[in-house]
Amino acid sequence: MFRLLTACWSRQKTTEEKQRNVTIIVIGLDNSGKSRLIEAFQRLIPSKMHKEMRPTQTTLLLDDYQVSIYDLTGDVKGREKWSSYYAQAHGLIFVVDSSDIARIQEVKIILTRIMFDKRVSGKPILILANKQDKKNALLPCDIIEYLLLERLVNETRSMCRVEPCSTIKRIPKRQQKPIVVGLRWLLAAIGDQYSELYTRQQIPNMSISTSKNIRGCGERCLSDSLPNRVRHSNRQHFDKRQHMEHRQHVEQRHFEKRQHFEARQRLIQRSLDARPLKPILQKDGFRIRPKKNMSVTFALDVIMEEGECSRKIGAPTISKPCSSQCYDTKTPDPSVDVSLFKAHKPKKRIETWDTEEMFLEDPREETFHSCD
């Protein structure tokens, strides 16, 4: 008797050890048939119900798995809470209304966003093309083409399967067989990478919980715990503060560089500006004295030979001063006005100095006047 009880206990222990707990979330747009799908699961697969079980959670026993299925709302508010379940789910079931062609683009956008989420990437996904009993329902091949599933699977490395189904009650059970076939495929895909998916779960950080309100009240699933929210909020504030400090530091460096560049430009401009001449210049006996606000043209009273001209500004024209000895020619007749036969020779002029006005003072000027 003791051996029989021991054998029964060991067999029960082995069976319990073989069973794996799997968490699956059912998502999709509103009116896609998620509620009917859960009811079909309960009709076709034995369910393990508990007294504390909430209306949105269903526990099923299939093969060697104890499956906890969570039905999430598909309205706009419900979609905001989907991401709270991605980390804990081993796999996903996405329900598509194959008869609603007008919303297929919306389905494509939402499914792409879900599959590219880092918490979902790599996890198996079962897509159920629901409402195949209607006339205008899309075939699975059309859904694959519209949703670009081949590209999504290759880029996200997530296994995916499209299964046509219909969840209405009036059809025979054998026509609802694709639902069970799809669920078995999903569990097999989870079992192949169960250890990896188990490590990706964040059970200590977050626990899945559902609202006590009945279906239709809008708030079906609320799973964020307060400590995690506070921790996440503090992390966001810290990241923002780090970003602001880094940005201020970069702006300060740019301002200092701009100030240095402007100071250097002013210094270069100042060095390139024309500098005024010295107040008094003296060279070879000539004295140049500047005067303000006047443009002066210089003229020499000394008559120069033709072709004899110095292009250098300020170069003196040297002439011998007159002595007491005079070189007279023939004395003209006093009755004849000699000035009529003399050609007037203009005075030589030197170039104008535009920088400053200057007067030329020749120390030999008195000698020239004495000769006159």
Curated annotation (Swiss-Prot):
Xref: SMART domains: ARF, SAR
Gene3D superfamilies linked to this entry: P-loop containing nucleotide triphosphate hydrolases
Superkingdom to which the source organism belongs: Eukaryota
GO molecular function annotation: GTP binding; GTPase activity
InterPro entries assigned to the protein according to its UniProt record, in alphabetical order: Ciliary_GTPase, P-loop_NTPase, Small_GTP-bd, Small_GTPase_ARF/SAR
Family as reported in the entry's similarity comment: Belongs to the small GTPase superfamily.
Protein name listed in UniProt: ADP-ribosylation factor-like protein 13A
Organism encoding this protein: Mus musculus
